[in-house]
UniProtKB/Swiss-Prot annotation:
It holds the Pfam family TetR_N. Homodimer. Residues 44-63 bind DNA. PANTHER family: HTH-TYPE TRANSCRIPTIONAL REGULATOR ETHR, HTH-TYPE TRANSCRIPTIONAL REGULATOR RUTR. Involved in the repression of teh monooxygenase EthA which is responsible of the formation of the active metabolite of ethionamide (ETH). This is HTH-type transcriptional regulator EthR. Residues 1-22 are annotated as: Disordered. InterPro entries: EthR_C (IPR049397), Homeodomain-like_sf (IPR009057), HTH-type_TetR-like_transc_reg (IPR050109), HTH_TetR (IPR001647), Tet_transcr_reg_TetR-rel_C_sf (IPR036271). One of its GO terms (molecular function) is transcription cis-regulatory region binding. The record marks N173, N176 as: Inhibitor-binding.
Length: 217
């Protein structure tokens, strides 16, 4: 004898609801897509929530602000650039010229892999105290590491003792920031993207070590 439970037609499974990770990823993907065509200031929390298929209150469960979304997008770029800088510093004694070029190259390529995100970061520096404080901390770290590098090269007799190492390090890092972002934003005047690494490397090497033969960089 067949029971009712055996003859009952199985109910279809309910479609799985998006997980928290899925919703967060959707917000980030929406931000990346919008940044390709809009300035950061033109994008609202409502835009991000709508694009991710969630409500505005739900958005705030995952991010406290649109600036926090941008920080999440930029974080992997910064980690890649930071790692490249640290590796360059470690290899300085063996081949300082190649190490400096490689550090600049990794830094530029990291942000160049997502130029729209990098441009949004530059824009946020002018409008978001939260983002400005975050970026300032990174710049201070890179400047301090560069100053230590210059000092070490001077102490081992590889570089001349000229202007204060911290002043030189500050100027070089600020130059990198402005030159790279201008290239990524296709600003004029600006250095062409394919020439940025060679140009900055030339300036760094000549500033730290003095005049170098043409083609050394």
């Amino acid at each position: 004898m067949t029971t009712a439970s055996q003859t009952r037609t199985p109910r279809g499974r309910r479609s799985a609801r998006p997980s928290g990770d899925d919703r967060e990823a959707a917000i980030l993907a929406t931000a990346q897509r919008l940044l390709e065509t809009k300035k950061f200031a033109e994008i609202s929390v409502d835009d991000l929530a709508k694009g991710a298929g969630i409500s505005r209150p739900t958005f705030y469960f995952y991010f406290p602000s649109k600036e926090a979304v941008l920080l999440s997008l930029i974080d992997p770029l910064i980690k890649r650039a930071d790692s490249g800088f640290d590796n360059a510093v470690e290899s300085m004694p063996a081949d300082p010229q190649r190490a400096i070029r490689r550090g600049i190259e990794i830094f530029f390529n990291s942000f160049g892999s997502h130029p729209a995100t990098a441009r949004a970061g530059t824009e946020a520096l002018k409008s978001s105290p939260e983002f400005k404080e975050f970026w300032s901390g990174l710049m201070q770290k890179w400047i301090a590491a560069t100053a230590a590098l210059i000092t070490a090269e001077r102490e081992r007799g590889a570089a001349p003792d000229t202007i204060p190492a911290l002043d030189l390090a500050t100027s070089l890092n600020l130059m990198n920031e402005r030159t790279m972002m201008a290239a990524l934003a296709d600003e004029q005047p600006g250095v062409a993207p394919e020439k940025v690494v060679a140009t900055l490397t030339h300036i760094w090497l000549n500033s730290i070590y003095g005049t170098l033969p043409v083609g050394t960089a």
